[in-house]
Amino acid sequence: MKNKRNMRLRIFFNLLIFIILLFIGGHANAQKGLHINEVFSRYGNSKGCTMVEMNDIDIRGHRINVFKTLTYKRYAEEIAGIVEADRKQAKKIREVIHDGKVQSGCLMMPPTRKGHNRFVVFTNPINGTGAVIYIEGKVTVDDIMKICYKRNCKKRQIT
């Protein structure tokens, strides 16, 4: 009787560990196949950088599976090189150019096996601070532009 109980407990715990590893593994490999993964792994814990990761969230009415962001004050050249490597694989590219230089952009990367769209959004350093965002979910380029670039501007009347 004790052996049966121990066997059931062992099977239960093994199954539980397997399920947990499946869930964690899906988010841990979110950027699999993208160069941007290197930015988060290399600079995520560096001095002058702030990294935030959120999973399965709603942002402005859009369901996001993975939202990962890194702001940095250093490493601009290194990070720009890594973003450029992903730019070459991008399916769609939207950029904001000012005075002939790319200020920010949104790269639509190839989707995941589950059909989730993947995006790399970036801003090049202005006053020394830049940002890189990885977004994964059933959202479109237009949704990402609304999420990341929506400005809270009030109309002013000029008299």
Predicted region positions:
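Short, surface-exposed beta-edge/turn micro-motifs
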Residues: 61-67, 102-104, 116-119, 128-130
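N-terminal secretory signal peptides
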Residues: 30-90
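Bacterial Sec-dependent N-terminal signal peptides
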Residues: 1-36
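C-terminal partner/receptor-binding element of secreted or periplasmic proteins
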Residues: 129-159
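A short, solvent-exposed beta-edge/loop patch
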Residues: 108-141
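Low-complexity, flexible helical/coil segments
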Residues: 56, 101-107, 145-146, 155-159
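Terminal interaction module
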Residues: 36-43, 72-73, 110, 149-159
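Mid-chain, structured segments of secreted extracytoplasmic proteins
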Residues: 72-117
